[in-house]
Swiss-Prot record:
Assembly mode: Heptamer of 7 subunits arranged in a ring. Interacts with the chaperonin GroEL.
InterPro entries documented for this protein: Chaperonin_GroES, Chaperonin_GroES_sf, Chaprnonin_Cpn10_CS, GroES-like_sf
TM ranges: none
SMART domains the UniProt entry points to: Cpn10
One Gene Ontology term, aspect cellular component: cytoplasm
A Pfam short name: Cpn10
HAMAP family named among the record's database cross-references: CH10 (MF_00580)
Name the record gives this protein: Co-chaperonin GroES
Domain of life of the source: Bacteria
Record family assignment: Belongs to the GroES chaperonin family.
UniProt-listed GO biological process terms: chaperone cofactor-dependent protein refolding
Subcellular location: Cytoplasm
Cross-referenced Gene3D superfamilies: GroES chaperonin
Amino acid sequence: MAKVNIKPLEDKILVQANEAETTTASGLVIPDTAKEKPQEGTVVAVGPGRWDDDGAKRIPLDVSEGDTVIYSKYGGTEIKYNGEEYLILSARDVLAVVSK
């Protein structure tokens, strides 16, 4: 995973989606049109967190760079940067962090 010059703002997270499987367990090849949208990816960059209701301090995020996360199927904004595809998610779109 290469370093990216994108810094998310507030409670946003930059994720590179893990590739969806291209073959089934029985060996059938899945065409691109039939693939499920991936819901798992690696966190590439993390914003500083959002401000609390008083605006006095930032609330840090529960994820950090390098974490593998599971996120909402239709959450986030897809972007392309330097030929790579990324997803910018809000922290509330992240459903879980995968333990290693």
